Amino acid sequence: MSSGCLLLLLGLLTLWAELTPISGLGGPKYCHLPADPGPCSNYRPAYYYNPASRKCEEFMYGGCKGNKNNFKTRHECHRVCVR
């Protein structure tokens, strides 16, 4: 391979690396909201995406209001927020 081809390949790889989202950063903006149990007290386990750990984690949801970073299963949280 000529040096020109190698430079082109290196440039394309660099561009690809810059444009490829880091896992978890490609999801909806609400995936970066904090866990919000809401004002009610009908507590049940739920899952939210934690951008600091880049994982879906369990929290206790009160059953009403809160925000959209709230999923019934870890699988659903992962499907929506981890990319």
From Swiss-Prot:
Tissues of expression: Expressed by the venom gland.
Supply the InterPro entries for this chain.
Kunitz_BPTI, Kunitz_BPTI_sf, Prtase_inh_Kunz-CS, TFPI/VKTCI-like
Major localisation: secreted
Where in the numbering of this chain does the BPTI/Kunitz inhibitor domain appear?
Answer: 31-81
- Disulfide connectivity for this sequence is 31-81, 40-64, 56-77
Q: What Gene3D superfamilies does the record point to?
A: Pancreatic trypsin inhibitor Kunitz domain
Subcellular location(s) per record: Secreted
Keywords (A to Z) from UniProt: Disulfide bond, Protease inhibitor, Secreted, Serine protease inhibitor, Signal, Toxin
GO terms for CC? Answer: extracellular space
List the signal peptide residues: 1-24
In the record, what terms sit under GO molecular function? serine-type endopeptidase inhibitor activity; toxin activity
Which superkingdom is the protein from? Eukaryota
The family this protein is said to belong to = Belongs to the venom Kunitz-type family.
Function comment: Snake venom serine protease inhibitor.
- Protein known as: Protease inhibitor 4
What species is this protein from? Answer: Walterinnesia aegyptia (Desert black snake)
Lineage, top ranks: Eukaryota, Metazoa, Chordata, Craniata, Vertebrata
